[in-house]
Amino acid sequence: MEVKTFAFLQIAVCIAIGIELICAGTNALNDEELFTVDYCGTNCTQQPNGSWTTCPGNCSCYHEDGKTDGFCLSTEYTDFTQFPNLTSEEMDAATPRPE
């Protein structure tokens, strides 16, 4: 009797964990937040005095510990929840018109 109860509880826990993982996976796919990383086309290097060469524009130098070279990357976080849902009329008004 105890073995059957223990086996039933194990199965119930496995099912609960599976449902939780499925829900977490679908929730992660529906997040309306976007983090983008773009390569700026240049690299950065550590100078003999310990400082790093500058990156162009809004790019920053990212490097591994102990390495003397890195990549110039631009990072941006966009939260799409701050934008309202547009109506059809607003979409039509924002559509470019041919000349």
UniProtKB/Swiss-Prot annotation:
Disulfide linkage: 40-59, 44-61, 55-72
UniProt keyword annotation of Endoplasmic reticulum present: no
Glycosylation sites recorded in the entry for this protein: 43, 49, 58, 85
Signal peptide as annotated in the record: 1-28
Molecular function terms, GO-annotated: C-X-C chemokine binding
Cell compartments where the protein resides: Secreted
GO cellular component: extracellular region
Function, as annotated: Salivary chemokine-binding protein which binds to host chemokines CXCL1, CXCL2, CXCL3, CXCL5 and CXCL8.
Name of the protein: Evasin P1162
Organism: Ixodes ricinus
